[in-house]
Amino acid sequence: MAVQNRNSVLILSGRERGARMLGSQRLLQQLVEDRTRWMKWQSQKVELPDNPRSTFLLAFSPDRNLVASTHVNHNIYITDVKTGKCLHSLVGHRRTPWCVTFHPTIPGLVASGCLDGEVRIWDLHGGSESWFTESNVAIASLAFHPTAQLLLIATNNELHFWDWSRPEPFAVVKTASETERVRLVRFDPLGHNLLTAIVNPSNQQNEDDSEVPMDSMEMALFRQRSLLRSPPVRRTPILHNFLHILSSRSSGAQANDQSRPAPEPREPPSIPRFQYPVRTEPADRPALQGCTQHLGLGCLCSRCAASRNLFTQNPTGLQPSDSTQPQTQSGPSAFSPAPSQTRTSDRPSAFSSVFSGTAGNSAHRGLLPLRTIDPLGSQVPSHLEAPGRLPGADWSGSLLSTGHEHGLGAIGVETSSGRGVVPPPRTSSSSMDLLSLRRFPDGSSSSPIYTSATEGRGLVLPGTEPNRGRPNDGTSSGHHPFYDNTQRNNPASIRNVLQCNLSRYFMEYERMQELERPGGSREVAGGPGPMQELLTSSMDAERPGPSHNGSSHTGNGGAVATPSQNHPNRCRSCHNLLTFNHDTQRWERSGQTSSSSSSQEGPSWPLSVPPFEDPGQTARVEAQAPEMRPMELGEASSGLQGQQPMGLVYNQETGQWESVYRQPTVSASSEAAEDALNPEVPVDNPDEDSLRRRLLESSLFPFSRYDMSSSRDHPIYPDPARLSPAAYYAQRMIQYLSRRESIRQRSLQNRLRTLSNSQADSQSNNPSSVPPEASDGDYEDIEEPGDRTRHRMPRNARMSAPSLGRFVPRRFLLPEYLPYAGLFHERGQSGLATHSSINRVLAGASIGDGQSAVASNIANTTYRLQWWDFTKFDLPEISNATVNVLVPHCKIYNDASCDISADGQLLAVFIPSSQRGFADEGILAVYSLAPHNLGEMLYTKRFGPNAISVSLSPMGCYVMVGLASRRILLHPTTDHMVAQVFRLQQPHGGETSIRMMFNVVYPMAPDQRRHVSINSARWLPEPGMGLAYGTNKGDLVICRPVDFRSDGDNPSDLNADSLFTINSSSRTRGVERPGTSRSGWRFDRDMGLMNAIGLQPRQAAPSVTSQGTQTPVVRLQNAETQTERELPSASTFQNTHTTSRHTVQTASTSTERHTHPEMTHTLVQASVSEGSLNRTNLPATYHVESAAEPGTGEDALSRIRRLMAEGGMTAVVQRERSTTMASMGGFGNNIVVSHRIHRGSQTSVRTAQGGNPTPEMPAGLGVSTLFHTEPLVDSLEAPGPSGSSGAPLPTPFTNRSEFAGVSPMVESDLFGDRQPDDVQRRPSRGGLNMSNHSNNNNNDHSNSYSESRSRDYPDDLYGR
């Protein structure tokens, strides 16, 4: 802020002369911002239609002329900032819009997301586009990219990337578990970086696991089915990541070899593009819809794969320009989905260039060219076309090749519909769906990373044909059987999904290997273990994908080099079950017999499914018959090829993924294997159940993430310290389920018996497969069937494992590992449910009126802020909780709980206080986003849990904190502080780094007892324009600076301001004036002042009391919010502040004048209602009236001027109905005005009017000053000694009265030294009572001022 020349006059004059000063514009804007801080603020309530009950969020248009507000009535209102008129009502959301944002560069484009899971993009010129999340999960946050046609959507634990010209998002990334919900997304002003806020699993996992419906995976499945509309896509990405990881983990070279198989274009139509159910255009892209293109992953569907291959063939990348071109079309055109679809296929996405350029790096998960990813418009042809259009697709191809070269070959995931290339995630687990990628470079797995079991939906790998029920679409990369209608209904598809999910996990487990071993040796040998086969077959069958995908990928069904990639990916997630066979040191596809597993390394997977055979169809068929699908897959593959690739086996010895082929007989074995899976699982769908169980088990198997081999030896509940996070979660799940499912187990066990019988039968039918018991037996060894049942966890169960890098053993559960033993963990990590429950209880209790914001802040949930480089449009690896962490723990309530400055250099957010054991405290922290000190905490300020909204001013010099009401006890007040404004002044200065400026006050009706809370408070985007906030009462209030109350930025003003912001109730001595509320004080004060001035008769004595303590005792007060403890910040209106400032100035001036013996003491405004006369409250309480009695013909102003000129003031104190007058020189009753008056001491600026105040000058005398408050202030400011007649009293009396009203409060607050009642009360009738202790200070002047003019004051009036 320090600039060479801060003189605005010089800058402006130089500008007129044409001189250009570097930074002059910014300097002027800063001056404006600083200047307005001293101005009086005027609030304007916007008249909104329908009188909404609550206002949630505010967003400003790029031209700074419009503000959008979301309301509980499900509407969004667009208001003109300058006029305060509501211009548009956006109606259509079925539930409350929780977030809203304007496009930063396209005028008139607004995006909103509601609690019903609907995202709408509105063109204010007409038209809108909408997309629904799967299962209608609430939309937590939205963010437009400033330059690309890209909208980021945060919902649940997923981050979707949507080009709204398409029917649904083209990419999705997931966190490592469902507990790690994404709460906020934000681009920096240039779109170079992306900020994400994600729940720290450690905070909630233990306590919130219970929140997860752990009923069973079935529940999840059913839910998924019910959510059919919601595309499985996001789950698919998880799989994709998983697959990527696998393939990348496996020798990339093999993947390269295989990845290259030409993708076949066919199937594009069947593939649902991205699988996001486009509610509006599903028909348009039925096939394409099947294509799911995730984040930087290419669509896995055959079409996409084919197109990718084409792309590869046509390496031409989309032009960066294309990529940069965001279709900025605003208006309906931007929203016409169909055209956009075609257009999308035609036009490269903003991201295409990135991908085409970087596609080769498997490390980068870039967004495939948006358009490329999903040529929605054209189905097969579009894919075919896409290659040309979307050379970026080449990226996928190159990824495959380069990735392989890198050893991270992108995995060409064969969705049933086709092969998709999935670039290996940049970080194994981070980008996609949580697939916590396990790195299997050696075939050894680190702890498995789980996406939550719930991920299962998406788990059906594209390769998986879980969608079989659903034709090609289901298989396409994101498609999950559950999402497919057919699939949904088809338990097989469900279990396929589950299996896919589980398979990832299982792959990690030796157990699977053991299961395989029973047939495992065979498997490797060429016979699939029943378990393996089952897993693979069920998964594979469901997803003929791996085989057929590979084949489809190949186009031949012959082993394509890609298959390994596909398979590894699919295998892992879909293929289920690559199991690592320690004996063979290979990852083997469980359930598949790999006759030549070793012989055919990953690259050679000949997918049994005919290449580009409609894998979807095969998948569908298989899906239809859960039992059949393993067989079918095997059969189909065997039929297609003598050997069907059962799966990839990772050969640790060779360090490569090897294809395992299933013998034609595999089908039977697979069936048996499936049976094997099912037999023990008491789930409705044995597969589902077994999968659930296995998923849990699998997470448990590698109890020691570092020692898979020993995992089987571990007890079911091994030492948590040895558990990988996934295993740990699984263990907890199992425990939880064991508690919850006792009833469930009975029915499940019955089912299990039935399943076992049926499976036994199937086994007998398929002797070739290893007895299911054997395969299950391995698991059985680890756990008993009952346990297994318990293990079953819903897909949604929070089994997610932290990303690979995060291994947090016991800290979740064991208090000894917690940072502190307090009830409230800063990080909320405690595994003790009591912590969260206590927090919730306290939150509810402290809120009183049910402010959820406060409750959530008291609760121990915290979020991590991660800062992602988005310059290359790389997908953020949000599944990795350890990378790019900017703020490890913070509090997020809504999109207003975090703010990035307009210049992109500062980030303001609330963080938990240090571990004090109580969550009732938080800290406002401002971090640097500058590259040289990224993440450095510059400013801090302590607040309570009611601080929920933060906004940085346009110039980044001030920060406003919005406050939710948390008070339990209410008292009437006309002014309610809803926000506080601070100045950022000293980096690294601790609590002094931020200085309190003023309070934002919400005017309330005196009879309103409901406290007001702010949901969102924002600075208007233009410097000096003001601010706006939305309240829980439905108000949208715009506050603007209207005029200056003081002549300059006088430091005294600042102090005064703070003084006057003190709570009206004087805290001096901690005594509260009896019975008067601030609102009452204000009214009485104003009336008293007016009466005193003679402007209007007053029947009752004014209730304003003022003390004349010479020393202003500045009291730090929490401005009604527990948060503020600095200088008193009053919840009084800003205008009050201004007045107070003025009064302060006068006071200070008066101090100056004190030097002038003749100056009257600053008079303390005091008019107090009789009740307030209590000396306990104030030493002197008087109703001050103008010097002359109201009856005099002289008007009040001239009277005041005359009195001031005379060097003494006469004050009329009215009590009851009697009026007494005291001259400045004579102190009546103990009105004490100390000779030494500090700036803030005289609350009434008016005091300055008098000549130097006599030490004993009664506050009452000050009354006249009070009346003149403003004039006095002016005079004080302008002239020298208050005594000087020259002091102008320019301010209107009304203003004075306002000031006076303020000053009494201030006085009482400021003057800590009030004379004891008795002392002050003994008025000396004709003379000053120096005895007044405060007066004593002024003795020297007091005599001189004691004019016997003062009238006899009735003792009773001031009597002790």
Curated annotation (Swiss-Prot):
Keywords: Autophagy, Cell cycle, Cell junction, Cytoplasm, Cytoplasmic vesicle, Cytoskeleton, Endoplasmic reticulum, Mitochondrion, Nucleus, Repeat, Ubl conjugation pathway, WD repeat
Transcription is among the record's keywords: no
Region entry Disordered, spans: 249-277, 315-364, 412-490, 514-573, 587-616, 664-688, 754-796, 1120-1142, 1241-1360
Compartments, as annotated in UniProt: Endoplasmic reticulum; Cytoplasm, Cytoskeleton; Cytoplasmic vesicle, Autophagosome; Mitochondrion
Source domain of life: Eukaryota
SMART domains reported for this sequence: WD40
Family the UniProt entry places it in: Belongs to the WD repeat AMBRA1 family.
Protein name as catalogued: Activating molecule in BECN1-regulated autophagy protein 1B
The species this protein was found in: Danio rerio
